[in-house]
Amino acid sequence: MSKIDVAEFFATVKSKHATDIAREHAYRPALEKLLKSINPSLTVINEPRRIECGSPDFVIMRGDIPVGYVEAKDVGLDIRKMKGANKDQQQRYRDGIPNLIYTNGLDWDFYRHDSDGNSQRIADVSIGDYLMGLQSNKTSFPALEALLYD
């Protein structure tokens, strides 16, 4: 098992956010590095080809088989209170993707389809607080690491 470094990921997100010009795509290299650290045998693709329900930001592959997708939103966007087009997209992805992670870099929601094919949030964790100027919640780092390994 390789080492996931959530602290390094958070520090990178915080540093980019501090520029006050970073947006959603600016955080993707750090997210890709974090996802690749889960297991060296996995392939992580940023901006994969479109699938039936849309174009999630990342696909995680084992060989040529997709094992999960990740949708990354901008830091500060509340992924648990989506509205409008973001809410519609989230529902499409939850309905169409059996193993999905939604994140804004700080909040992480993990969805899996149950035996009936219905999307269920199986876990959520927050590794930082946006309202307090991007303060880390280091006690949650191990929980995120465990969820990513799973």
Predicted segments, located by residue:
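A short, conserved, highly charged catalytic patch centered on acidic carboxylates
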Residues: M1-N99, D107-Y149
